[in-house]
Amino acid sequence: MQTLSEFEISVLENLALILPLPERVDDDKIFPDPTRKYSPEELAALLHLYGKYRDMTELEILHEYVDYALDLIKDSPRLPAMTRLITEVADLGRKGIIHIPAWIHKALQDAVTRDTGNPTELVESLLLLYLVNNDKAAQRKAKHIINSCYRAARESETELNGRIDCLHIAVTCCDYVSRFNVRKAGEAWNEISHRIFAESYNLSPDKIFNLLEAANELAGYTPIPSDARQKLKNRLKETATPHSIAACAYSRYAALYL
């Protein structure tokens, strides 16, 4: 995807101030609702989707969701799951897709410092800190977590949801794994998917999405059954209702790119 110049982004931002939101005529787009109170999880999923905008309408939608995200981050920086949202916004800025205020990088640093939740969820944030600030300590911490994830992902005794997250991190960040073996990672993916269908596990949309992203990375290098991937996409689509915006975003992304 071609990166817009600063001038082009500036023109689009000025147009966004004077033009109304796009008409809601395309069923495959998730248009912003100014009356809705979006959660950090929902906005992060929407930014992940529209960061790959395909047309001008989707770019306008992206800008609207970024505005919502910035307001939420500024007003409620300590909400659960805020670290991921801040990371999505900061990464869009790093890629030159949007302009972001300078305080976002400080917000990212603060969020990573105070986040005491699941270390797996910090990996992308830590790697982004390394990219934008050349923070070698963040890179080392991320590498340690990624290698721990790789080991946990290959252990059948690891709790299923945690194993899915660990496999996703290990595969999508495999350059940081000391001895990454794509065949063994593929075996872990197939074992997980077989267990899900054999035992009728009810996975949350984000776990299904993580499995699909991992499969997309692995498929060109090791056997990943296409029927298993399609079953997961179908499950994800079933969760996508107007009341579950994050699931809708995940499902749309999977249909387009996975």
Region locations from a protein language model:
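Amphipathic alpha-helical elements of HEAT/ARM-like alpha-solenoid repeat scaffolds that form extended
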Residues: P40-Y50, P80-L92, P119-Y130, R163-V177, ...
